[in-house]
Amino acid sequence: SIFDEYPIHQTSETIDRPAVSDPNVYERFYFTFFEKSGAAAVGLTLTLHPNRGLVDAAFGVTTGRRYESLMMSDVLTSERENISCGPLRLEILEPMRHLRITIDGHTDFSASIDYRATSPAIREDRVTRSRERRVVQDRTRYAQCGSVTGTVVGQYGELVLNENNWTAVRDHSWGIWDGPKQHTTDI
């Protein structure tokens, strides 16, 4: 990764290698864009699973009573400056300030969305949880408000996102998250 050039290493590994081998190590970007009247919303999650070698993403659009979604999974590469998952790409144009989301080459969706921060990122307290002496969560997250511009095209038609009529929130989290467990019997 180009980031190996920077003095930011926390272990003797390259930046793309987690410090622990737990398969539940993750890094997630989450975005929600709302039309201020409530007529439409767009959501996106993009999750890197470096110890599994995978990246997955979900993109959804709600208009009125209609919801359409696109689920994707792909091989995770070592490059982190522009992250892609199938037809979806996340570009970090100015860290903590300006990010771009594009969907290109898919038959049902296309998108070009620019997120710009309107607030500083607010870091939440670290969350650590154990289950029977095993760490199931150890994660950090920050949240941020922003503005959004761009277009989303799907089978429902075209949405034009602009700063006057839309608002945006996002978060970025990383660490270990084992996720909820299903019990074999009801408790």
Residue spans for each PLM region:
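Structured soluble/peripheral alpha/beta segments that form catalytic or ligand/cofactor-binding pockets
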Residues: 1-187
